[in-house]
Amino acid sequence: MRLFIAALIAESVREALREACAQLQRAAPDRTLRWVAPENYHITLLFLGEQDETRIPAIIQAMESAQRGIPPFEIAVQGLGVFPNWNRPSVLWAGVSEDGAFLSHIARALERTLLPAPSGKPFRPHITLARCKMPCRDTEGLKKRLYSAAQQLAPANFGQYKLQATSLMQSTLTPDGAVYTVLHTVAL
């Protein structure tokens, strides 16, 4: 099973992001961008990859432990950016800010507990909106159109909501894209 742990998105934020992506798609209608389906928007806390089903109880226990003592908290979704940078865009994302760095705390605790060798990379909470298929055709033209459209939306505030839980998700890859299924939810 292909698994990850995520913070799911409020419907009002999902709708605002869907509208922003529709604007971006009109401004940069390029087939080298693979847009994430709005129902799949989420904040990844930890990608686990292929896991045996027998590990699920230990994963749930790690989620409960990582979240112990953390109350529900506000998350704001605002602004757009790319990874790794505008010279080589591979992922278009919406920014996430939070009260108290709770997402970072949970993500680091999960990584320490569930990964054999933690990555050491800083946790950068975000919502992936699109990925660039490699190799990108017309990279310069795409970058200019995407950058211009994203800059118009960059200061946008897509909303905020109170995160009440995290979810263990299964990702099933299909020719039409990934299908995500909630396997278990752990309340804050």
Model regions and ranges:
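Histidine-dependent nucleotide/RNA phosphoesterase domain, centered on the 2H-phosphoesterase fold
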Residues: 1-188
